[in-house]
């Protein structure tokens, strides 16, 4: 039984797949988004104990997401190759949503850390803005409204760093590792479906090439068989005539590849003719039992 014969049509698995991509995964992603909001709130307010608990709860949601994505993988691997394009179209939206949610969660903390470092390193520069003509009024220096607003928003947006002596610092590292693993799982899942489709396309190309080769090979074998059959009586006559008698009889059949003979030149020729007819009948029987291979021209026309 071939690998594809063990798989099933998409319509048989579609209800289960739709349940995951329409209900299960979106529910997990919504729960993860709420964890992200709570984490941001507790970290901004420096409520480290609550933040630690939220990190743990978010980690459980991430693990549930990973488990559900693996279940979808198992279902997708059972789908027949004919339905892979439709399957890919079906799962792409939820895959992209999961990837974006994971990246957003990781990016929030990353940007906050980088911004805090930038504020620390550039503290003196921020206190002494560059001078321009438009910024000097009556000898007093003023920052532009846009720059002041930007600095204010940056300070509000950036989350405070978690103290290393807090449990929340360690729990964040664990959650971060889980999020990265989830992101990699989503990427691998996407590559799995794409690689299956590429494999099918490659197989189709090889099948087309093989069909051309088989078609040409069949023609060449037919020609060779005809030449071989035509040579059998002549070779039988020549060797049978040279040897003569019962030995010539056997030699005539040896050339044809079968032990039978009639002896002498004429008998050698006759032996070759008999074998020619026998092989001809075998070829006709074999040819009639084999299905005709469709030519590439017929395939293109159809």
From Swiss-Prot:
One of its GO terms (biological process) is endoplasmic reticulum to Golgi vesicle-mediated transport. Keywords: Acetylation, Autophagy, Coiled coil, Cytoplasm, Cytoplasmic vesicle, Endoplasmic reticulum, ER-Golgi transport, Host-virus interaction, Lysosome, Membrane, Mitochondrion, Phosphoprotein, Transmembrane, Transmembrane helix, Transport. This is Syntaxin-17. The gene is STX17. Residues 162-224 form the t-SNARE coiled-coil homology domain. The chain crosses the membrane at residues 229-249, 255-275. It is a multi-pass membrane protein. GO terms for molecular function: protein kinase binding; protein phosphatase binding; SNAP receptor activity; SNARE binding. Residues 250-254 are lumenal. InterPro entries: SNARE, STX17_SNARE, Syntaxin, Syntaxin/epimorphin_CS, T_SNARE_dom. The modification N6-acetyllysine is found at residue 41. It comes from Homo sapiens. It is found in: Endoplasmic reticulum membrane; Smooth endoplasmic reticulum membrane; Endoplasmic reticulum-Golgi intermediate compartment membrane; Cytoplasmic vesicle, Autophagosome membrane. The modification N-acetylserine is found at residue 2.
């Amino acid at each position: 039984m071939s690998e594809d014969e063990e798989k099933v049509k998409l319509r048989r698995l579609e209800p289960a797949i739709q349940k995951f991509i329409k209900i299960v995964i979106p529910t997990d992603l919504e729960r993860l988004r709420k964890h992200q909001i709570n984490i941001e709130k507790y970290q901004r307010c420096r409520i480290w104990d609550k933040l630690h608990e939220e990190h743990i709860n978010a980690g459980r949601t991430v693990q549930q997401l990973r488990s559900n994505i693996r279940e979808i993988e198992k279902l997708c691997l059972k789908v027949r190759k004919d339905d892979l394009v439709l399957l890919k179209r079906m799962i792409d939206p939820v895959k992209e949503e999961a990837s974006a949610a994971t990246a957003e969660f990781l990016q929030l903390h990353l940007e906050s850390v980088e911004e805090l470092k930038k504020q620390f390193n550039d503290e003196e520069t921020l206190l002494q803005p560059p001078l321009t003509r438009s910024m000097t009024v009556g000898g007093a220096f003023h920052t532009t409204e846009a720059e002041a607003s930007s600095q204010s928003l940056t300070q509000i947006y950036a989350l405070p760093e978690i103290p290393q002596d807090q449990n929340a610092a360690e729990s964040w590292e664990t959650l971060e590792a889980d999020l990265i693993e989830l992101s990699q799982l989503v990427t691998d899942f996407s590559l799995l479906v794409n690689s299956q489709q590429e494999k099918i396309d490659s197989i189709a190309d090889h099948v087309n090439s093989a069909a051309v080769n088989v078609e040409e090979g069949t023609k060449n074998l037919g020609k060779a068989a005809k030449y071989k059959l035509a040579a059998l009586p002549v070779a039988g006559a020549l060797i049978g005539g040279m040897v003569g008698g019962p030995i010539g009889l056997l030699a005539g059949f040896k050339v044809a590849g079968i032990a039978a003979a009639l002896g002498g030149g004429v008998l050698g020729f006759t032996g070759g003719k008999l074998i020619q007819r026998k092989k001809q009948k075998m070829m006709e029987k074999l040819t009639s039992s084999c299905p005709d291979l469709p030519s590439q021209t017929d395939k293109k026309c159809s």
